[in-house]
């Protein structure tokens, strides 16, 4: 698994902890890395994502709301909601990362940590977010 992949997995765990525990993102990040080893590149990416999502939470959640018209954000499973936040933030802030990579990685995290339906749900919502943002893969 590459550094960004491991970073995304760590970021998901931290985003989940931020929401579940009510602690600030910087506090969760500091605690997480005291208890969990990680390579420097993966750690840096995870930290950037977690802090970025926390700082841009209103915009990230609004992008998710617009793309998931049949699901209220508050009613989504916590894992799905945080995978969507991670993927939406990347789509909004990391234009150098291909759309397909962001979606594939998010779907894999959703399948690993979510329910049986999580992968398809996350794929559909993130695909709509990408379209709303005008993110198109060049090789499509």
From Swiss-Prot:
GO terms for cellular component: cytosol. Involved in transcription antitermination. Required for transcription of ribosomal RNA (rRNA) genes. Binds specifically to the boxA antiterminator sequence of the ribosomal RNA (rrn) operons. It comes from Sorangium cellulosum (strain So ce56). Gene3D superfamilies: NusB-like (1.10.940.10). Coiled coil: none annotated. The lineage of its organism: Bacteria, Pseudomonadati, Myxococcota, Polyangia, Polyangiales. PANTHER family: ANTITERMINATION NUSB DOMAIN-CONTAINING PROTEIN (PTHR11078:SF3), N UTILIZATION SUBSTANCE PROTEIN B-RELATED (PTHR11078). This is Transcription antitermination protein NusB. SUPFAM superfamilies: NusB-like. Belongs to the NusB family. GO terms for biological process: DNA-templated transcription termination; transcription antitermination. It comes from the Bacteria. The gene is nusB. GO terms for molecular function: RNA binding. InterPro entries: NusB-like_sf, NusB_fam, NusB_RsmB_TIM44.
């Amino acid at each position: 698994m590459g550094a960004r992949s491991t970073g995304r997995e760590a970021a998901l765990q931290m985003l989940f902890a931020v929401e579940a525990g009510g602690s600030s993102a910087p506090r969760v990040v500091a605690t997480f890395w005291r208890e969990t080893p990680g390579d420097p590149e993966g750690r840096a990416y995870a930290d950037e994502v977690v802090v970025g999502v926390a700082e841009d939470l209103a915009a990230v959640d609004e992008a998710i709301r617009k793309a998931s018209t049949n699901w209220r954000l508050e009613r989504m499973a916590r894992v799905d909601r945080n995978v969507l936040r991670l993927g939406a933030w990347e789509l909004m802030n990391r234009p150098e990362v291909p759309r397909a990579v962001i979606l594939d990685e998010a779907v894999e995290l959703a399948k690993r940590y979510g329910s049986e339906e999580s992968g398809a749900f996350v794929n559909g919502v993130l695909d709509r977010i990408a379209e709303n943002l005008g993110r198109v893969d060049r090789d499509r």
